[in-house]
Amino acid sequence: MTFLSVFANGTTQAETPHVILKIEHWSTKNGVPVYFVAKNEIPIIDIGVLFHAGSAQDNHSPGIAQFTAQMLDQGTQNLNVDQIANRFESTGAHYSAGINQDMTVLNLRSLSAPQYFNPAFSTFSVLLRDATFPQTAINRIKKQMLISLQQESQTPSALALKTFYQTLYGSHPYASPILGNKTSIEQVSEEQILNFYHHNYVAKNAMIAIVGNVTQAKAMSIAEQLSGMLALGNASLPMKAPSMPHIKNHIIKVSYPSKQTTIFLGQIGIAIKDPDYFPLVVGNQILGGGILTSKLFNEVRDKRGLCYGINSGFKPLQAAGPFFIVLQTRRDQAANALSLSQQTLKNFLAKGPTSQELQGAKQALIGSFPSSIASNEGILEKKKKIGFYQLPLNYLDTYQQKINSVNLEQIRHAFQRIKPEKMIVVMLGKQ
């Protein structure tokens, strides 16, 4: 349990849980950074291989990063898609691949006993080295991604978010939609996939995270085997900083046949290494991050019933990700809900939080932190973030302390970079 005491000046002092995760860090012979945590409570090993190969690397082929990631387990020189799936299933292992704007992540979860881990790891390694991208699989993934695009077009929140990103980032690579578009996916060729694969799935572009019931010596062997599957290649260039688009109309209305209106409003936010990261995290918890306790929820949903749900957030990336407020409301209430959301934000910027609100936000963030690293998966996710974005090795050990050290003035100062009058607004619904 965390105990918090509030002092007269509005700062907060806490007896924070002293969570220590011993993260071992080294590089393989060909320079791939490795992050390892031994966790022996359960007989599981989790491995993540990350590449600087997110949708921001799509260039002129929207969706190619996602397409390539989905193709890796579709066939190798000696195994077809069914044989690959059977090899993982027969050992109880789970393989997955996913991307965001910055990265592609390949994950393996396996029992640690050699009779299960060795064949699962062997199959995982082969996918890195010997993926062949057969045409039959390309056709199959095309169909799957076109279905996903159709589902996206039928999901108001997903369609509004896609429009928000494309409007906010304009010509910046973060505007590239993860799923691509119908035309780009229909035109994907084997040559495009191979070019993306050979350019991005290389040692200079990679990072490895390992968590679980394994010794450091064995983890070093695992990392060497994985990195040895990769050509050396070249690292992707650092992502350029985005800037707010120069457009006359900041309100984008998208016609959609739904009874409710989905609204996104926001601006360019922060990169993950921004010095204001912690004041903004704590401040956002007060503004809209605490789903049932935030100012936005209290003013727009609880007091006036103008929306079904509302929240705000930052999505820090390698370069500046977005700051956003999102809500769903009835069409006839959309204008009032948007106006009140904007006014609530302006009031927060003008007055800042109270000492009591600061206490509550810290308590919520500090209190929820231990559970986020209680499992292998949670630790792996945190290590991916630390390794990929080159955060300090003691990031997890100091997280609660840094949350606790945030004061009212830091929040007020950090939030002055939020400019309501320049925000992009996307309203999706019947017009």
Question: What residue ranges belong to the model's regions?
Answer:
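His/Glu-rich zincin catalytic helix
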Residues: 3-91, 122, 194-299, 424-431
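M16 family metallopeptidases and their MPP-like homologs
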Residues: 37, 42-67, 81-127, 158-183, ...
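Short, polar/flexible loop-turn hinges at active-site or ligand-entry regions and domain interfaces
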Residues: 78, 128-136
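Short, glycine/charge-rich beta-strand/loop segments that flank catalytic centers
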Residues: 101-108, 136-147
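Short, conserved secondary-structure transition motifs
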Residues: 110-112, 145-152, 243-254, 364-372
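Active-site glycine-rich loop that binds ribose-phosphate moieties when present
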Residues: 188-192
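Acidic/histidine-enriched active-site and ligand-binding environments that engage anionic O-linkages
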Residues: 193, 411
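Short, exposed beta-strand-loop hairpins at the edges of beta-sheets
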Residues: 415-417
